[in-house]
Amino acid sequence: MANKESKNVVIIGAGVLSTTFGSMIKELEPDWNIKLYERLDRPGIESSNERNNAGTGHAALCELNYTVQQPDGSIDIEKAKEINEQFEISKQFWGHLVKSGNISNPRDFINPLPHISFVRGKNNVKFLKNRYEAMRNFPMFDNIEYTEDIEEMRKWMPLMMTGRTGNEIMAASKIDEGTDVNYGELTRKMAKSIEKHPNADVQYNHEVINFNRRKDGIWEVKVKNRNSGDVETVLADYVFIGAGGGAIPLLQKTGIPESKHLGGFPISGQFLICTNPDVINEHDVKVYGKEPPGTPPMTVPHLDTRYIDGERTLLFGPFANIGPKFLRNGSNLDLFKSVKPYNITTLLASAVKNLPLIKYSIDQVLMTKEGCMNHLRTFYPEARDEDWQLYTAGKRVQVIKDTKEHGKGFIQFGTEVVNSKDHSVIALLGESPGASTSVSVALEVLEKNFAEYEKDWTPKLQKMIPSYGKSLIDDVKLMRATRKQTSKDLELNYYESK
């Protein structure tokens, strides 16, 4: 039986992952004391902000990097199933927050939007068709459509077909159940709900600057008020570091062994933003292409409709932009300060192993707006320079670590959970699809670090997430019932299986 004594939890950062974790903890243990510290003046300013990411509800409907071609030409869709299930889990939790009154007006943060995959060239068309055949035979994706007909593509994505002829070899697949998610608005809603909780204290313009672990295992957390300069020490049984790009430096300050042999490589995302309403109104889908050969998953180009502040907009990217800051609002010394005697060999090994990635990043940095526009024209041939502006979005810090399987300096893509041996310190590192799978990440944190509470928490988690403990991949009936319910809760369109 778990110790029912009230615990003190310090949460660092007010992005989507931290507010998701905080939202769960306040329902699982209402008597626990939650202190959430954000160094900026409001929640969701960094990578969670709607202007700092593409807002894709990552469900593996159109993202081709989740479906891998095997040597025999077949397509492995196992990762796509996993990503889709994780997004369905997120939708269940968001629906619960709406039904329980913790947040309101789901259309403020999630909107239905078809997801399309688009490719050109004989080999890519063959890949997409094989992917379609593999996915349409699996219940999660059985509403997928496929075409090589330009006239059908004109119906799906008219903007992208302007100026094209039927002579070009190309193909597209479409799933109508896709979404656009305003993670910034979702974060703000969850943060506001936490602020109202009687045992929560949310402080903005407060920065965690250091840690000290007492002999009794309690953490002393030093927090600086960025307005007054005052420093206070708060006590914590658990420290949750969800500070985005700032997580690695904070993890290093804890001094836990798990923070060693770990580093980060900061990369910004840049997007072309459309400023012409006539162009914006011609495109009402998310269209993902295929990453160029030999480049990492972050290079997948996409042309996205977005819903921001109740208005439609249009963006294309991403283009990488490297720099020393770990956060948009960070310091040019972030990268250099993160280099320690215990991780310098890890970072150097990574540089040697990942020369193609470094070359790609440098090429991207040197790319002008003209170069970005040329990339856009592979999607939208008639794009005009005057209709688009180049915008630098959020930071991602690629995790670099030593592993038994890959040796020194392995670059980890996706979201990584790091915790101390005694589970008192938990840090979330990495990037996409973090926001879309934030609920599954929070559940992983709970399962790995709060095992003694499993018996008490399982019924509560099943109330929040009805499929908790079950498989939406294996249980088709449950998957369909879950989708139908979350579509109702979140005011989304529901499509019966074909």
Curated annotation (Swiss-Prot):
Keywords: FAD, Flavoprotein, Oxidoreductase, Tricarboxylic acid cycle. One of its GO terms (biological process) is tricarboxylic acid cycle. The keyword Oxidoreductase applies. Pfam families: Mqo. It catalyses: (S)-malate + a quinone = a quinol + oxaloacetate. Coiled coil: none annotated. Belongs to the MQO family. This is Probable malate:quinone oxidoreductase 2. It comes from Staphylococcus epidermidis (strain ATCC 35984 / DSM 28319 / BCRC 17069 / CCUG 31568 / BM 3577 / RP62A). The lineage of its organism: Bacteria, Bacillati, Bacillota, Bacilli, Bacillales.
